[in-house]
């Protein structure tokens, strides 16, 4: 009898536990059903399909549900070049691309124009919010636009359209000399090229074996690189973004087999 009572007690407890777990789990998934899945039409931004967006502390792959371009992605199998890119910036990229806020220069570099901050997971000032306790955005240059699908949407005032040009060039080894804290901003100042391309296009890059012998010698830290003249204040960050934007394509749109862009 005691054995039967024990079995019944365990069975009842297990049943209640499963029901309760299912209830709370379903509550947490309601937000996904109501605000994310099949809600692309709830986002009314004219150019959303032709720019990249950022999703701060949101459900992974929200952009995929909405079928829009994003710098965020939970995908373990990606191109080797993506892994190399993040590694060059000193950023760990394991199974997902989720660039931290301190590498804010990566946003304009990747032509990221909008940021989505889900309102259902925390109030302003919490770590789940792009807005700090003083009401300021945690990255420079972002301005509140509107709220849709329970997402606060911010626009990048330092946005650089896709397809922009550089007039300065640095070798990969020069870029390695920049501290990780400023590498995302350094990307906005000069195009980073491997040594063979620096040499191949020396009439443009200014490369010469004599000029770069220190960089490729035993003491590369003694090389006088233009990266030492890059400034990383907020005002300089704004200036370099505006400069890149002035030298960008006048129009850009995706096509079935790539993209179409116009540059005047």
Regions found by a protein language model. Name each.
Residues 6-25, 35, 39-112, 159-222:
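Extracytoplasmic/lumenal acceptor-recognition loop(s) of multi-pass membrane glycoenzymes
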